[in-house]
Regions:
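Cation-handling catalytic/transport regions enriched in His/Asp/Glu
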Residues: 1-184
Length: 184
């Protein structure tokens, strides 16, 4: 029923079941092994949610930037190293004041990318505090923004939005694709 209701036509129920089986047979055992290693290295009998973010070597959290401008400049260098077009798109966000990244009193929590339909320029919102996670979030949201730039030429507004099954593909892929450039 849901396949018909959601107008899904590019993959089948059998594809979903096969994907589930693949995760169960390949990813689950790897996750269990990693969890066991984490438990052992932390000297715990049982892992709890708050144990998952702890560095098992006891290293302090990374502080890759002090000022938001440093993060923006670093991300720009990363994107320009990957592709002139990506770098130019990212710089366009800054030039058009479409990056609201500084934390400040009274600012809503979270991070997101929002496509401004009239100007057809994405807007990125987050609360940067100098952490590695902030850099990852910026790159993730930039992935959404790049997807918006590339779909912005479409005439109908509804064609510019990605369906829920695809919405995170561009952003999560951008996180992975940028890894080789993080020394920039």
């Amino acid at each position: 029923y849901m396949f018909a209701a959601m107008h899904r036509f590019d993959y089948t129920i059998d594809d979903c079941l096969e994907f589930h089986d693949s995760i169960e047979s390949v990813c689950q055992p790897l996750r269990h092994k990693n969890d066991e290693d984490r438990k052992q290295k932390l000297g715990l009998e049982k892992l709890r949610p708050w144990d998952m973010g702890v560095d098992i070597r006891g290293r302090p959290p990374l502080k890759p930037f002090k000022e938001v401008k440093e993060m923006v400049d670093g991300c720009s260098r990363i994107f320009h190293s990957m592709s002139k077009e990506l770098g130019d798109y990212f710089d366009l966000l800054e030039a058009n004041d479409c990056l609201d990244l500084d934390s400040r009193k009274g600012k809503a929590p979270g991070g997101y990318q929002y496509y401004l339909q009239k100007s057809r320029i994405p807007f990125i919102f987050m609360n940067a505090a100098g952490t590695q996670r902030n850099v990852e979030t910026m790159i993730h949201e930039a992935g959404h923004a790049f997807h918006s730039f590339y779909s912005g030429h479409l005439q109908l507004i509804h064609e510019r939005d990605a369906p829920i099954e695809f919405a995170e593909v561009a952003s999560m892929s951008m996180e992975l694709l940028t890894h080789p450039y993080w020394g920039e």
